[in-house]
Amino acid sequence: MTAVVKTLSDSKADEAEWALRCDMAAIFRVSARLGWNEQIGNHNSVMLPGDEPLFLINARGYLFRELRASDLIVCDLDGRVLRGKGELRKVAFHIHARIHLTNPKAVTVLHVHPQHLTALSMIDGGELALAHHNNLLLNDRIVYDTAGYEPVHDNEEGDRIARLLGDRTIMVMGNHGVTVVGATPHEAFDELYIAERTAMYQMTAMSTGMKLRTIPDRFRRNYLGPWGDTVDARMHLDAWRRVLDREEPDYAT
C-alpha cells in the first residue's frame, strides 16, 4: 500500500507541488539551523499529489543549509530520477521509497541525526521515559529499532524498517538516528521537533546522575499536551517560514 495522496488537476497539482517544495525547503533550512543533519548524508521526502506514486527528495551532495525549493528532485518508487538535477542517494531510496510504499500515513518521511535522539539511540535500552509532558503525546507514537546495526543498503532492510515502523510515526534507529513520518510536512516536522526537545530534556536530566521523576502512567491517555492539534503544527512551520522569509528568502526559489 502506497502513501495516500490526493489526485488534482494539472494546474492545482503544480500549485500543490510548489507549496510542498517550499515547505520541504523550509524544513531543510531549519534542520540545518538546529544541527539535525549529518554533513550531506541525511534526507527528507514527501509524496506528490497525483495518480502516479512520485516523491520529492533532496539530491545527493547538498548541504541542508543551501537547499532551495527548486533543488528537490522528483523520483518514482523504483528510484528513477524523473525531474531535477542530481542523483538519488541509495540509502535514501531504500529508506524513503519502502516506507512510502508500505505506510499509508507516510506522505512525508524525515530522516535526520539530531544530537539528543541520536545519543539516546546509542544507549543500551535507551528510550524516552514518561518524564516530561511531551511524552504523554509521544510515547504511544515511538518505536525503537534495536536490530538495525548495518547501513541501509538494500530494499530488504528498507522493508524491515517500514514493517517495524508500522502505524507509529517516530522510529529511533539504534546506533543511527531518527525517522519521522507524517501526513503532511508540517506534522512530521513538528513531531520531530518535539521529540528532539524531549530527548534533550531527558539527556540533560540523566547527565545529573539523579533518578528521573516519572509521570504516573494513568495520565498517558488522559492528556495529549498542547501539540495534539495539527493546526499548531502548521502554525509552527509557518512561524519558521516567516523567519526564513526575512533571513534566507532564497529557500523558496
Could you tell me what each predicted segment is?
Residues 1-253:
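Glycine-rich flexible loops
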